[in-house]
Amino acid sequence: MKLVQTIKELQSELDALRSEGKTIGLVPTMGALHAGHASLVKRAVAENDVVVVSDFVNPTQFNDKNDLAKYPRTLDADCELLEKVGAAFVFAPSVEEIYPEPDTRQFSYAPLDTVMEGRFRPGHFNGVCQIVSKLFMIVNPTRAYFGEKDFQQLAIIREMVKQIGFNGLEIVGCPIVREEDGLALSSRNARLSAVEREYALNISQTLFKSCTFAKSHPVAETQKFVEDAIAAAPGLRLEYFEIVDGTTLQKITDWEDTDYAVGCITVFCGEVRLIDNIKYKG
């Protein structure tokens, strides 16, 4: 495995491999890797000849400078994990390498990017599209892998690729990876205290219970079930919970409105903002 920090070196390496007919998988990350990321890389390794993992904390997608400053950075540990799971290259550029000058590009994929995360984190998805599109242009991968935990992000990236093309790039969504007790794996979990970690379990437990509840109750009652459960749980503050069409991300009012229904949630546990989702249909 090779650690690469410049675009020029990475492209030189990949051009040589591409000329041999090799397929290239890309797993974009912001580092602070965990077993969820490892599962993405393993899938990419199984489906491509060569896998590139980007390890870059992208400043343009943070609308909160405090959140950016606190985001964990663990490159040495990341490289250790990536070597074990078979990545060929770790691309860990500086901010100056990626953004030699400010990126002023504006991406708009309404209504996908105006709801949920888009409503509460203005500019976030524009920053995501800036970095992901740059990585696609730098790496020119055959396939790129994203986790379904960031459900809205995955939908927006699919739409971006549909509109821009990127040489027929295939976007592969991979299931949420959870701890044995159900907590969705997240780099932000490292910021939870032991007590907060216990509190955070109520998020996934509530979603799992709501799946059973939804089988015999309408959408509005399922919505209220989740909102009430989080409100009653210690140490948690609900930012939003929405039951949406999994393709359009628009709210549904009846289970018959769609064949693909997903509940998306964001909760503050102390100062740590956690996201999760669950499929009700589809």
From Swiss-Prot:
Subcellular location: Cytoplasm
Assembly and binders: Homodimer.
Reaction(s) catalysed by this chain's protein: (R)-pantoate + beta-alanine + ATP = (R)-pantothenate + AMP + diphosphate + H(+)
HAMAP family: PanC
PANTHER family listed in its UniProt record: CYTIDYLATE KINASE/PANTOATE-BETA-ALANINE LIGASE, PANTOATE--BETA-ALANINE LIGASE
Catalytic activity, EC: 6.3.2.1
Function according to Swiss-Prot or TrEMBL: Catalyzes the condensation of pantoate with beta-alanine in an ATP-dependent reaction via a pantoyl-adenylate intermediate.
Encoding gene (name): panC
Binding site for ATP: 30-37, 147-150, 177, 185-188
UniProt: beta-alanine binding residues: 61
Domain of life: Bacteria
Stated name of the protein: Pantothenate synthetase
Gene3D superfamilies linked: HUPs (3.40.50.620), Pantoate-beta-alanine ligase, C-terminal domain (3.30.1300.10)
Source species of the chain: Phocaeicola vulgatus (strain ATCC 8482 / DSM 1447 / JCM 5826 / CCUG 4940 / NBRC 14291 / NCTC 11154)
